UniProtKB/Swiss-Prot annotation:
It comes from Xenopus laevis. The gene is brd9. It is found in: Nucleus. Residues 1-16, 31-41 have a biased composition (Basic residues). InterPro entries: Bromodomain, Bromodomain-like_sf, Bromodomain_contain_prot, Bromodomain_CS, DUF3512. Residues 17-30, 468-478 have a biased composition (Basic and acidic residues). This is Bromodomain-containing protein 9. Residues 78-182 form the Bromo domain.
Length: 527
């Protein structure tokens, strides 16, 4: 401490003595001494710079001999594609518009709470830079899509009055204008009112160190439209009519590029377009995904382009049936064949079966309903009511409506049958439809004898006959029809049950319908 203090005092004394001496010197002498001091300082500075240059050269030689060359930095520079160089150039220009680094790195929950609950696909400049280095971008459109996603995320999470929202909106407008087709091709017309800023060219040291300078051809294209790349920040954010139109145009061009890339990716050889009608009535077809280098591809739409030429002697086009959509006849529940093969509803008619299907949906629903009703058949009324309520809840009330309609239909049929008198002699006209009518003559004799005799029905014999009739009816409904439709299918058991000795019906009103054990001519013909 004492040494430094003494040195300072000596310097002050020396300066005072020099100033006192300069008081008595002329102006020429003072100028000469100043020049000598200046030359002395320059000489000392040159000597120090020379020593540092020699030291740096020696150190580089030592590092070059002792340390191997790191090829990992020079390797990507040699293999980087022109597209990568262009995207790196765009990324650097966009990062300059973000001086505070809001979009430089990924957003975390500590910085923005609940960010990942709102934003499902985050994006930032570092992620885009990594994708460029890994050559994941196949076109400028994909790069623009990620850039738009980053700005949209910021405008979605933040409010319009925040700094982040305003910067994202400004950055989106600037970036799309910079990456527009007109800016890439150098066809955008710049106005004289907007000042063109100076282009700061990177030095040679920066090129060697960072390896981020674009190629000469690409930079030549970029220099043709400097205003679109280096846009002043004030004009970029002002949403006047002209800038708003440019912003919308850039968004439309970006959407069109995305659509064209998707079409070329999924449908490489397709030609998609739209129809446009002119004022004179002509119709044109414009291709959307044509070659961008060529002019707009349009075609005139008329009858000759839609069909072949008309023959001279014909005034109408020939009709050709399309066999690809031919309608075939379906086997529905209302057909006689399905009724004969149906073993579940042998005692129901087609309209009743249609009601069942309308109420329960399909065979599974009908079987489920029948199973539940069979389960509580021997139970009390409370269990049956519960099952009916359950089926109403499942079918939405269709169960009760279906049962009510079927009961109405069966009741009306019974009233009609009780009031009608069956004439057996009218069945003789069906002798030519493969029915065995030999028993009808005997039935006529039995009927005449019963009119004269006042006998009573043996109830025991009738109760024995009913199960036999029911078995025969089930066998006929569930058996497969015979292939020989012209022959009678009546068996010995049928003849035995239908013989006059077994039928002692008398004058009773509860006579069974003969159709229960006689084969119908309609079903026989359909089989």
């Amino acid at each position: 401490m004492n040494v430094s203090v003494t040195k300072r005092r000596k310097k002050k004394k020396k300066k005072k003595s020099e100033k006192e001496k300069d008081k008595y010197l002329d102006e020429d002498e003072r100028r000469r001494r100043k020049e000598e001091k200046k030359r002395k300082r320059e000489k000392e500075q040159c000597d120090s710079e020379g020593e540092t240059e020699v030291f740096e050269s020696i150190r580089k030689d030592i590092e070059a001999t002792d340390r191997p060359v790191r090829t990992c930095r020079t390797h990507p520079e040699n293999e980087s594609t022109p597209l990568q160089q262009l995207l790196e150039y765009f990324l650097r220009q966009l990062q300059r518009k973000d001086p505070n680094g809001f979009f430089a790195f990924p957003v975390t929950d500590q910085i923005a709470p609940g960010y990942f609950m709102i934003i499902k696909n985050p994006m930032d400049f570092s992620t885009m830079k990594e994708k460029i280095s890994q050559d994941e971008y196949k076109s400028v459109t994909e790069f623009k899509a990620d850039f738009k996603l980053m700005c949209d995320n910021a405008m979605t999470y933040n409010r319009p009055e925040t700094v982040y929202y305003k910067l994202a909106k400004k950055l989106l407008h600037t970036g799309f204008k910079m990456m527009s087709k007109a800016a890439l091709l150098g066809n955008e017309v710049t106005t004289t009112e907007e000042p063109i800023p100076e282009i700061i060219m990177p030095t040679a040291a920066e090129v060697v160190k960072k390896s981020k300078k674009p190629s000469k051809d690409m930079f030549r294209v970029m220099e043709e439209d400097q205003s679109s790349i280096f846009e002043p920040e004030g004009n970029a954010c002002s949403l006047t009519d002209s800038t708003a139109e440019e912003h919308v145009l850039a968004l439309v061009e970006h959407a069109a590029d995305e659509a064209r890339d998707k079409l070329n990716q999924y449908f490489p050889n397709c030609r998609i377009g739209y129809l446009k009608k002119n004022t004179d009535g002509t119709l044109f077809y414009t291709v959307v995904n044509g070659d961008p280098d060529n002019e707009e591809d349009t075609h005139l739409v008329d009858l000759s382009s839609l069909s072949s030429k008309l023959l001279p002697s014909f005034t109408t086009l020939g009709f050709k049936e399309d066999r690809r959509h031919k309608v075939t006849f379906l086997n529905s529940t209302g057909t006689a064949l399905s009724l004969q093969n149906n073993t579940l509803f042998t005692n129901l008619k087609p309209d009743q079966i249609e009601l069942m299907y309308a109420g329960y949906g399909d065979d599974t629903g009908i079987q489920c309903a029948l199973s539940l009703q069979e389960f509580v058949k021997d139970s009390g009324s409370f269990a049956k009511r519960m099952v009916n309520d359950l089926l109403d809840q499942i079918t939405g009330g269709d169960h009760s409506r279906t049962i009510y309609q079927i009961k109405q239909m069966t009741g009306s049929e019974r009233e009609g049958c009780s009031n009608s008198v069956l004439d057996f002699m009218t069945l003789k006209s069906y002798s030519d439809v493969s029915l065995d009518m030999s028993m009808l003559s005997s039935l006529d004799k039995v009927k005449k004898e019963l009119e004269h005799e006042d006998s009573h029905l043996n109830l025991d014999d009738a109760s024995k006959l009913l199960p036999d009739f029911h078995d025969v009816h089930n066998d006929r409904g569930g058996s497969r029809p015979s292939s020989s439709s012209s022959m009678s299918n009546n068996s010995e058991r049928d003849h035995h049950l239908g013989s006059p000795s077994r039928i002692s019906v008398g004058e009773q009103q509860d006579i069974h319908d003969p159709y229960e054990f006689l084969q119908s001519p309609e079903t026989d013909n359909q089989n």
